Amino acid sequence: MTDGNLSTSMNGVALMGILDGRQGDSLQDLQHLSIKAAPRSLSVPEYGPSLKLGALEDRHSLQSVDSGIPTLEIGNPEPVPCSVVHVKRKQSESEIVPERAFQSACPLPSCTPSAPTCSEREQVVRKSSTFPRTGYDSVKLYSPTSKALSRSDNVSVCSVSSLGTELSTTLSVSNEDILDLMVTSNSSAIVTLENDDDPQFTDVTLSSINETSDLHQQDCVAETEEGRKLKLLHPFSHFFTRNLLARKQNARLDRQRDLGWKLFGKVPLRETAQKDSKKTQKEYEDKAGRPSRPPSPKQNVRKNLDFEPLSTTALILEDRPANLPAKPAEEAQKHRQQYEEMVLQAKKRELKEAQRRRKQLEERCKVEESIGNAVLTWNNEILPNWETMWCSKKVRDLWWQGIPPSVRGKVWSLAIGNELNITHELFDICLARAKERWRSLSTGGSEVENEDAGFSAADREASLELIKLDISRTFPNLCIFQQGGPYHDMLHSILGAYTCYRPDVGYVQGMSFIAAVLILNLDTADAFIAFSNLLNKPCQMAFFRVDHGLMLTYFAAFEVFFEENLPKLFAHFKKNNLTADIYLIDWIFTLYSKSLPLDLACRIWDVFCRDGEEFLFRTALGILKLFEDILTRMDFIHSAQFLTRLPEDLPADEVFAAISTVQMQSRNKKWAQVLSALQKDSREMEKGSPSLRH
């Protein structure tokens, strides 16, 4: 191939590929472009038969072949050194022309460079100029044989992928067609032209610069080896050119195409095409006609955490996109007013919620402050002088407000007392007996305890099984008394030790809740002492020993004060035959620890330790008074269900406010006097209706 002259005034457009006609064909006269010798030329290494290149007649611009396509001025493209043009022509029988590639740097040099040597030709990196994205021009070429083409020049573009990405373009060129390409300025092209008897297809693959440069270095070595083999296989050169070598080229192009992973037929964006989010936002604001303001460092800082309307951050008033018709002025004003109304309502809701939270916080701070002051009062004034101050009005008022949790266990122990004189050593003895009994029952041992002679092994075994069952159902929401919990063994020890301490009472359902509340506020031994003395009280002993006559006496006394304080609800219950034992048994057995929230139950226990069993029935009347309006509209079934399963969110202040309105006097008789009178009148007690009219 001889050196061809190409003018430097092509505005950055370089020739990318040459297609030779078959032998015997002639080139037609070019209509738009003639190539002739010029003093300034681009030196192309000679690898095969000479191929003459002419200069462009128009040195300033290129014109489109189709008059319907506007002619665009093309600026000098940036040098892209990785575009390779592969040219293959049909081999004649007398010569073997291997597949070659030539280079052209971009922009074109102003002077004719010297021809490279053989070694330089082998080491040189093949490059080709790339057209700008807006360039679209037709180029017509001479063949080395000065013969005219038999058909008019045309180009058929089969498929072009989206610009700005890795392009994969397929051009269909006939035997005498020429190439007209449109290439982006930031892509490189690998063009393979074949001139055979078969219908010819030209594959143009545009890839990134870095990927193409690596492949060309591998292609140079492969092409050199292919050319050397073709010279040795002269008779079969046409066969290898059409099949084997083309297959290798196709494999190489497939490898080129596989470099980019395609999802649903779309080529992913290159790293260089990714834009910054800030730049994209700025471009959008410029298109929308709003000037972009630099973000302030204080822009995202909320001045007032309490009254900032958080809900409005997800509600943004935006104009329509630039590609859509603008809103009418009336519609835009209407939308803005609606937006402002929504923001105003959101601010009101946020303000109301913030005020509620602030009020709760203030109340909590007041409660914590009062608890702190109460702790100091209990520790410094009351507990050191317990015997003289526990019945004073000041202490009783503090008691009603609730004992601080830090001193609650100590106050409970002092208020319950230790009339049974139980010591820690006695607790250890009872616990050891309980463990020995558990072991003997598990191994099936004989009865060796003389004191347990009146109790069968079946009763003791049933009692132990009942303890195990009740422990699993004690405060299940806390998950601290169940198997594996931190207080499981302590609760099991107290209940087991009590069954050994009072075998005549044994274990009764409901004891586990009382023992659990004591464990939460006392040590194990102190909890056992308080538990034993508490169950020794007359009311608890009557219920846990299931003294039916005495239990009816307590129910009758309760109905006396029930009728005195809530006559309307009392008559409604009488009408529906709803007796007190339906709801009182569970409340008295567990001391409200199962029926009410734990915090509220502890406050009830505080006053119960001060006032005794009277406060248990007063609390029952307070609960009935709190829900009097609801209960009067219920029938028997719904009333029983409601009272046996009270709401879980009962506020302590409302409950104690209702309790404070209950008067525990009936005809100038207090609770103790009424209960004593009922115990004396056993006959009236058996009828179930107390008679206090004498």
UniProtKB/Swiss-Prot annotation:
Pfam family, one: RabGAP-TBC
Keywords noted in UniProt: Golgi apparatus, GTPase activation, Phosphoprotein
UniProt GO molecular function: GTPase activator activity
Region described as Disordered: 272-305
Name of the featured protein: TBC1 domain family member 14
Gene3D superfamilies for the chain: putative rabgap domain of human tbc1 domain family member 14 like domains, Ypt/Rab-GAP domain of gyp1p, domain 1, Ypt/Rab-GAP domain of gyp1p, domain 3
Biased composition (Basic and acidic residues): 272-289
Record PTM Phosphoserine, positions in chain: S92, S296
Disulfide bonds: none
Xref: InterPro entries: Rab-GAP-TBC_dom, Rab-GAP_TBC_sf, Rab_GAP_TBC_domain
Described purpose of this protein according to its UniProt entry: Plays a role in the regulation of starvation-induced autophagosome formation. Together with the TRAPPIII complex, regulates a constitutive trafficking step from peripheral recycling endosomes to the early Golgi, maintaining the cycling pool of ATG9 required for initiation of autophagy.
Subcellular location: Golgi apparatus, cis-Golgi network; Golgi apparatus, trans-Golgi network
Predominant location: Golgi
Subunit and interaction comment: Interacts with ULK1. May interact with RAB11A and RAB11B, but does not exhibit any GTPase-activating activity toward these proteins. Interacts with TRAPPC8.
GO cellular component, one term: Golgi apparatus
Residue ranges of every copy of the Rab-GAP TBC domain listed in the record: 402-612
